[in-house]
Amino acid sequence: MPGRAAHQEAAAAGGAAAEPTAAGGSAGAVAQQPEQQGLAGAFPLVLKKLMENPPRDARLDKEKKIKLEEDEAAAASTMAVSASLMPPIWDKTIPYDGESFHLEYMDLDEFLLENGIPSSPTHLDLNQNPLMPVAKLEEKEPASASTGSPVSSSSTAVYQQSEAASSTESPPQNERNTPSPIDPDCVEVEVNFNPDPADLVLSSVPGGELFNPRKHKFTEEDLKPQPMIKKAKKVFVPDEQKDEKYWTRRKKNNVAAKRSRDARRLKENQITIRAAFLEKENTALRTEVAELRKEVGRCKNIVSKYETRYGPFDLSDSE
């Protein structure tokens, strides 16, 4: 009996121990289900994080790939623009430091020969473009006007009237070439001549204009030498005979003598100042003539050199 009781107690204890185990198993299964549901919900979040923030190595690879594609596109465009393998001219830089920069010598005659340009004017063919005489040119003008577009009758009439007026007004060619005569009085020579104002006053007629040595001209009578007049012999007149008639005649003679002396001195002063100016003007004109002769000689030398090289002038074409 005691053994049976002990066996029953042991079985009861085992059953009690088995119940907690079963309860623990069911509790573990219930706890495992929420954990699986949490992992399934966290996977999309992790994937989203990976897409937004990829690893560094993957990002570097992507940047290298994009840069490589851009370089290939730029190379393709460069090759499309220029088929040359050399870089463009504008990308080159030429250093200029005085030593590495050198100018190349080129012979001018060789350059002209390579390009087919004559080296001297004697090789030019003047017959390629000959100058047309004026007469032929005038003959061609009405022909070209007749073959051109038609013009209204009113404009044609106006043109003919103006042409007729110009033809009547225009002088002949010979008259046009001849220069108009120059008045010698209008020619002024630059002369450094400054006479004394006192001499000009003494050479001027009292109450008249100031004497101008540049413009004044003398007549032939003025320049003739004055005749020598012999003075009358002095006649002694006693004081008893010096009446009113004597003194009147004496005053008239003195006034006439003074007037003649003043006129003679005035003319002498004018001639002296005029002669001084003419001497200055003559010197200036001689200098100008010498310079003009030098210029004419230089022009003659140029013309002679031209004629010896190209032949004489053809004045018919120029006319």
Curated annotation (Swiss-Prot):
<comment type="function">
    <text>Transcription factor that binds to and transactivates the vitellogenin II (VTG2) promoter. Binds to the palindromic sequence 5'-GTTTACATAAAC-3'.</text>
</comment>
<keyword id="KW-0804">Transcription</keyword>
<dbReference type="GO" id="GO:0000978">
    <property type="term" value="F:RNA polymerase II cis-regulatory region sequence-specific DNA binding"/>
</dbReference>
<feature type="compositionally biased region" description="Low complexity">
    <location>
        <begin position="1"/>
        <end position="31"/>
    </location>
</feature>
<dbReference type="InterPro" id="IPR046347">
    <property type="entry name" value="bZIP_sf"/>
</dbReference>
<feature type="region of interest" description="Disordered">
    <location>
        <begin position="139"/>
        <end position="186"/>
    </location>
</feature>
<keyword id="KW-0238">DNA-binding</keyword>
<feature type="region of interest" description="Leucine-zipper">
    <location>
        <begin position="266"/>
        <end position="273"/>
    </location>
</feature>
<feature type="region of interest" description="Disordered">
    <location>
        <begin position="1"/>
        <end position="35"/>
    </location>
</feature>
<dbReference type="GO" id="GO:0045893">
    <property type="term" value="P:positive regulation of DNA-templated transcription"/>
</dbReference>
<dbReference type="GO" id="GO:0003677">
    <property type="term" value="F:DNA binding"/>
</dbReference>
<feature type="domain" description="bZIP">
    <location>
        <begin position="243"/>
        <end position="306"/>
    </location>
</feature>
<dbReference type="Pfam" id="PF07716">
    <property type="entry name" value="bZIP_2"/>
</dbReference>
<comment type="subunit">
    <text>Binds DNA as a homodimer or a heterodimer. Exists as a stable dimer in the absence of DNA.</text>
</comment>
<feature type="compositionally biased region" description="Low complexity">
    <location>
        <begin position="143"/>
        <end position="158"/>
    </location>
</feature>
<dbReference type="InterPro" id="IPR040223">
    <property type="entry name" value="PAR_bZIP"/>
</dbReference>
<keyword id="KW-0539">Nucleus</keyword>
<feature type="region of interest" description="Basic motif">
    <location>
        <begin position="245"/>
        <end position="265"/>
    </location>
</feature>
<comment type="similarity">
    <text>Belongs to the bZIP family. PAR subfamily.</text>
</comment>
<dbReference type="GO" id="GO:0006357">
    <property type="term" value="P:regulation of transcription by RNA polymerase II"/>
</dbReference>
<dbReference type="GO" id="GO:0005634">
    <property type="term" value="C:nucleus"/>
</dbReference>
<dbReference type="InterPro" id="IPR004827">
    <property type="entry name" value="bZIP"/>
</dbReference>
<feature type="compositionally biased region" description="Polar residues">
    <location>
        <begin position="159"/>
        <end position="180"/>
    </location>
</feature>
<dbReference type="GO" id="GO:0045944">
    <property type="term" value="P:positive regulation of transcription by RNA polymerase II"/>
</dbReference>
<keyword id="KW-0010">Activator</keyword>
<keyword id="KW-0805">Transcription regulation</keyword>
<protein>
    <recommendedName>
        <fullName>Transcription factor VBP</fullName>
    </recommendedName>
</protein>
<dbReference type="GO" id="GO:0000981">
    <property type="term" value="F:DNA-binding transcription factor activity, RNA polymerase II-specific"/>
</dbReference>
